[in-house]
Every structure is written in C-alpha cells, then in structure tokens.
C-alpha cells in the first residue's frame, strides 16, 4: 500500500512539474491538452552503424536554399538525399527564427515564386494568416515580408520532401568528399551513424560553401563578418506567424565549424540572460541558435558585383530574380540602400558554379558575389530561387551524365517554369 501511494505521489509530482514547465512557470488551471501518441517506423538497419547508398543528387544543408533544392531535384525525378546537421529543415526561416521571409515581389508584381513560395503560402494559409498584396508597392521594403509560422513551415518542408521521394538524414554532415569517375563519394558522420554516399551531383547549400572548401575549390571571405542575429522574446508571448521578436546582434558570429558556431551561441545566450536580469522581464521565447549572415562565398565562374546588382543586370544565363536593398550590417547597425525604382536584379547560373569545377553546384548565401551584392542576395526568397535552380540543374545533369553548367539553358528554364518559378527575361 505504501509503495502504491508513493508511486501515485511521484506521478502527481511529475504531472505538476510538466504543468509548470510549459512556459517555465506555473499557470493556474493549466493542463496537458491531450496524451495522444504516434509510433515511429522501425528501421531495418537501425542497429547498423554503417550505411552505404547510391543517389543521383546529394544536397548538403537543409536550410533556406537546400530544402527547396532537394524538393525540386526529387520532383524532377532524381534519386535525392538531403543531409542536415540540425533537427529540421528551413534554416534561417525555422531554426534561425527569421519567420518573415522576403522578398518575393518588386515594384507591384511577384518576381520569385516556385517551390519556396508554395511552402510559404501554404504555411500562412494553414495558420490562418494573411498574405501581402504584391500589387501594392510598400513604403518600406520589409512591409511585404511574409509572416509565417516557423513550426508549420518546418513540418510542411518535410512533407514536401516525402512526397517528392527525398530521403532526409538529420544530425549528419560530410567528413570527407572524394572525387570519383562519375561523381563523388561522400562519407558522412552522425551520432551512431557512418554513411557512405555515392552520388553523381552535389548541391552545396551549407551557407558557407563547406563542401566546396572540403574539395579544395576557391572561396572568398572578408576579414570582418556581418554580425549574426539571435532572436528571442521578452515579456509577452510570442505568436508564430503573427509578430516579430527581439533581435540581438552577435558580432563576429562565424558558422565555419562547430567551435565557432558554439562560441556564437554561447555569446548570444549569455547576453540574453543579462538582458533578462536587467529588464526584469520573463523570457518567453528563444531560438535554438544564432542566425548567421556571412562566412564564405564561392569564387564562381561568374562573380556578381554590386554594380550588377544595383543596375538590375539581366545575365545571359539568369535563373532567378532577386530583390532586396543592399543590406550590409556592421557594428554601427544597418542602413539599407534601396534599389532605384523599377530595378530588379538577377542571379546567373554560372555564379552558382565553383570556378573550375564539375558535378557540384551551390545555392544560397555562398553565391559567387562581392560583399555588397551578397548583402542583398543572401535573403530568403532569393536563396529559395537559387535552390530551385540548383535542383533543376543538378538533376538534369545527373540524368544526362553531364555537369550543371553543360545542361542546355533552355532545358533549365523550361523545367523551372514547369514547376512554377518565374524566369528572368530581357526587355
């Protein structure tokens, strides 16, 4: 009888603890809404530490550009694997907490659509949110950024991958990358897992062109990096998809490796704790890590300059529009420099190709560009556009046993249009 009583007391204490832990405090009358459950699929090879597989396209990095690239490659018919070191897809939009991506429009019309827009639109609609009116030119550029529910977005991205036949490998990252006669051998490591992947094409969407660096191809880097941002909410409840949250600059934030990323996160969290104590407010929400703006960029077959960007140059091999002010963040803050009315920059396919390379393409903020051009190109909608183009180019190259830059541009453009993307055209 005594043992039974102790067990009941322990159970009650545990439930009470759970009630108090939901927002870090006790709330009168709070209960757990339901105790529903699901069962994860039992993996046949779960006890095997080593996995060997062959795919057409390996996407490294499931962030803003990477998950779009993977979905596109899968939809194009390529056998696709995406490797992501974190626990979810979406990158800046989800893990980074910048759940107000942009810009999909310019000067009264939509200029970036496709898979990225499909995900953003569905996440807003599923959350009962409101989409901006792109026919209206806002006074400030950020007014047409789209508020999304970051949690819904991450789940929808996984669903789209599953529907496209894309395999996801979380908590893994390449350890070695070796060139082969018909592509690459990539050895990835995760906890309890060693995965050897034979692939025809690699899409490097790591943000800092980590795979490009691993294979010895040239990268560009500034002595001073733009600060990262750590997002959090003090004093009032954060409503995903409804409001913006507080931002803390983490100067020197560097995503180059686990040590530099750890330092950025420790620095950011320490500063947030100091702010909580100073303001005597409750910490209601905090993202799991710093959002990084700048590390490495590739040296590509084309380098997009700030003059290319601000003049709205339409490259002969343009595969996506981009639209955002020149937006360089420094220790003194940021002063966006808006583009002249009617100007819409473009992104060239050759700016996604590391110089002198074959069978590898990048997507995202590591696009080949000078620093000022990159400060506008690195934003989410543009990265999604790059991701979709990289997915098309890599999958078509794999199918033809070719390399992305040798795929006929009309084929890339046709496939992009087929999947809803807006392809730049010359006036």
Model-derived regions, located:
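N-terminal secretory signal peptides
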Residues: 1-16, 39
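N-terminal export leaders
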Residues: 14-31
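Conserved N-terminal/central alpha/beta ligand/cofactor-binding core
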Residues: 22, 72, 78-79, 85-176, ...
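A short, basic/flexible loop-to-alpha-helix module at the beginning of a structural domain
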Residues: 41-54
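Beta1/beta-strand and adjacent pyrophosphate-binding region of the FAD-binding site
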Residues: 51-63
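N-terminal Rossmann-fold NAD(P) dinucleotide-binding loop
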Residues: 66
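Flavin (FAD/FMN)-binding glycine-rich loop and adjacent Rossmann-like elements that form
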Residues: 92-93, 154, 171, 190-201, ...
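Conserved beta-strand-loop-beta-strand element in the redox core of flavoprotein oxidoreductases
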Residues: 178-196
């Amino acid at each position: 009888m005594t043992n039974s009583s102790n067990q009941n007391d322990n159970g009650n204490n545990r439930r009470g603890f759970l009630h108090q832990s939901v927002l870090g405090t006790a709330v009168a009358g709070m209960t757990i809404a339901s105790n529903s459950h699901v069962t994860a699929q039992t993996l046949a090879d779960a006890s095997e530490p080593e996995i060997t597989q062959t795919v057409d396209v390996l996407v490294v990095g499931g962030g803003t550009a990477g998950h779009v690239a993977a979905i596109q490659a899968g939809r194009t018919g390529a056998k696709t694997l995406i490797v992501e070191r974190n626990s979810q897809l979406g990158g800046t939009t989800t893990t980074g907490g910048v759940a107000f991506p942009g810009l999909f429009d310019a000067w009264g019309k939509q200029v970036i659509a496709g898979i990225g827009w499909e995900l953003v639109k569905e996440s807003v609609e599923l959350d009962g949110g409101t989409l901006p009116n792109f026919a209206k030119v806002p006074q400030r550029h950020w007014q047409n950024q789209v508020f999304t529910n970051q949690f819904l977005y991450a789940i929808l991205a996984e669903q789209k991958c599953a529907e496209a036949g894309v395999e996801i490998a979380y908590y893994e990252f390449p350890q070695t990358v070796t060139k082969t006669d018909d592509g690459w051998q990539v050895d990835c490591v995760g906890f309890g897992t060693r995965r050897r992947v034979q692939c025809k094409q690699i899409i490097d969407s790591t943000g800092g062109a980590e795979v490009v660096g691993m294979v010895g191809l040239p990268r560009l880097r500034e002595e001073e990096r733009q600060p990262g941002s750590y997002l959090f909410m003090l004093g009032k409840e954060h409503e995903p998809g409804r409001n913006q949250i507080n931002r803390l600059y983490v100067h020197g934030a560097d995503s180059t490796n686990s040590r530099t990323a750890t330092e950025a996160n420790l620095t950011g969290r320490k500063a947030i704790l100091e702010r909580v104590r100073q303001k005597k407010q409750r910490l209601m929400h905090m993202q799991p890590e710093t959002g990084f703006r700048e590390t490495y960029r590739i040296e590509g077959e084309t380098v997009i300059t700030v003059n290319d960007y601000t003049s709205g140059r339409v490259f002969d091999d343009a595969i996506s529009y981009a639209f955002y002010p020149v937006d360089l963040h420094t220790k003194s803050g940021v002063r966006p420099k808006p583009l002249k009315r009617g100007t819409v920059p473009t992104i060239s396919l050759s700016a996604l190709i590391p110089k002198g390379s074959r069978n590898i393409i990048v997507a995202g903020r590591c696009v080949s560009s000078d620093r000022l051009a990159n400060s506008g190109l690195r934003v989410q909608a543009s990265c999604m556009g790059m991701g979709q183009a990289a997915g098309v180019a890599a999958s078509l190259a794999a199918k033809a046993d070719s390399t992305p830059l040798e795929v006929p541009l009309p084929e890339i453009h046709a496939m992009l249009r087929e999947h809803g993307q807006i392809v730049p055209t010359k006036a």
